[in-house]
A protein has these predicted regions:
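Cleft-lining beta-strand/loop regions that shape enzyme active-site pockets
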Residues: 2-4, 26-42, 46, 51-63, ...
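Conserved functional hotspot residues or short segments at active or partner-binding sites
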Residues: 336, 343-450
Length: 450
């Protein structure tokens, strides 16, 4: 079955369950046949427990608090990505997909049963402080994250601009936990950034998949076409994902009309297909996609679809491996559910859940100590001849590069993968490899302008 990508809430079954739950709590019932009978009996027990707590617990408890706690527990038994959202949390999610919210600027997930940083958002307090993709958050302030749901962790990290929160990080290869005290800010996300590399290579940095990402990318590609650029690098490193529809809208600009981009499959086994809806076939110019362990979800849809159609070469390191689809389901009281409703598959039927996308060409980022030495060498040449103090390796960012946002001051020289500033091509060996490959590509094949 083909899906219109504009539809987001395509699975509504859980709403029925919650309606039945409310019905039982107020004394209503329904036909006791099949699974309904089993569910009814279980809900009778739930109602009895609720009644006993209200009658005998040592302190008076609000029914709303008990029911919300039960809902959270219900969703916690499913998977780390399913969660209940209070009305306040639900509103924040709606704001976030539009590109602005308050907090420290990291996307989180569950990996190896621990709260993990999928990616820091470029130019935010978390990124500037040196938090990296792959870090594990073991405490928020002094509270352990062991039993926190994803939504609860998000809530604890967000807050008013100017307020502070301390995250305790466990980093692979570092023996002791690392405390980071961050000052919250308004997180504004510009999803598409561009520049020209080596005179004729279009570079597109996609930081997240938002409602406007497809439109913004289309505008950027049209501009590059006017400049007659001959090849493109699509940088998805440290892109934690976003909207499924945005991933489809980005992918369809590189494949022929009617081509399958991704399909999702729920427990009923039905395939919902998302096809390219472009009217005209795009130019088939050389395309390289850069990925790393911070590339997740919607990023992996793009990084899976385009190679399946022979439209791109993937360079970098293995991606995060989040291959499940969460649907946001609004509830009558203004709250909502974030529920895993399906898994997604690339056009060739590959699932990336827990495995990720393995690049065609594996290139690991430059070690931070090498970057620090290179930076010191440059400073010695440019300065008065006096050597400068070496950069502490622990403070040298190793996440991939990107262009500074308009209106922001870029760092003097970012380390490879420092998205808050402009890393030089010489320092970013993953980007360097992409440029080298495109140069070779141009030698062996006549290229059409973009």
């Amino acid at each position: 079955m083909q899906q219109d990508p504009q539809r987001r809430s395509w699975y509504l079954g859980p709403l029925v369950v919650l309606t039945l739950l409310v019905g039982v709590l107020i004394g209503k019932g329904w036909e006791r046949t099949g699974h309904a009978t089993e569910t009814y009996e279980e809900l009778k027990t739930f109602s009895e427990v609720l009644s006993q707590i209200q009658k005998h617990y040592v302190e008076e408890v609000k029914p709303k608090d008990l029911v919300q706690g039960a809902i959270r527990g219900m969703l916690a038994t499913l998977d780390p990505h399913s969660a209940y959202m209070t009305p306040e949390m639900y509103k924040e999610v709606q704001v976030e997909t539009k590109g602005e919210f308050g907090g420290v600027g990291i996307q989180i997930g569950i990996k190896d049963n621990r709260l993990a940083v999928i990616a820091p958002i470029e130019g935010t307090p978390a990124h500037r402080a040196g938090i990296k993709a792959g870090d594990f958050i073991i405490k928020v302030n002094e509270e352990s994250t062991k039993d926190l749901t994803l939504m609860d962790a998000v809530q604890k990290m967000r807050g008013p601009k100017g307020s502070k929160v301390t995250l305790t990080i466990q980093r692979d290869g570092v023996a002791d936990p690392l405390p980071f005290t961050l000052e919250r800010d308004i997180i504004k996300i510009e999803s598409v950034r561009t520049k020209v590399l080596d005179g004729n290579i279009a570079y597109v940095r996609l930081t997240q998949f938002q409602e406007a990402s497809g439109r913004d990318l289309s505008k950027a590609l049209k501009k590059f076409k006017e400049q007659k650029l001959q090849s493109t690098i699509l940088d998805l490193r440290n892109n934690p994902g976003g909207l499924l529809t945005a991933a489809v809208e980005v992918s369809e600009q590189f494949v022929a009309p009617g081509k399958l981009i991704v399909y999702i499959k729920g427990r009923d086994g039905r395939k919902d297909e998302y096809l390219s809806r472009m009217k005209d076939a795009p130019e088939e110019y050389p395309l390289i996609i850069l990925v790393n362990e911070g590339s997740a979800s919607a990023s992996e849809i793009v990084a899976g679809a385009l190679p399946d159609w022979g439209r791109a070469v993937i360079i970098g390191t293995t991606t995060f491996g989040k291959g499940s689809v969460q649907t946001i389901l609004p509830l009558a009281d203004g709250s909502g559910l974030r529920l895993t409703t399906a898994k997604y598959y690339t056009p060739k039927g590959r699932s990336i859940q827990s495995t990720g996308i393995t690049p065609d060409i594996v290139v690991k980022p430059q070690p931070p100590t090498v970057v620090a030495k290179a930076a010191d060498k440059d400073k010695d040449k440019e300065g008065d001849g006096k050597p400068t103090a070496p950069h502490p390796a622990a403070k040298t960012p190793t996440t991939p590069p990107a262009v500074a946002k308009p209106g922001e001051e870029p760092s003097a020289k970012g380390a490879p993968g420092d998205p808050s500033g402009e890393a030089s091509l010489e320092e970013d060996i993953q980007l360097q490899k992409a440029v080298e490959l495109l140069k070779t590509w141009k030698i062996v094949k006549d290229l059409k302008p973009l």
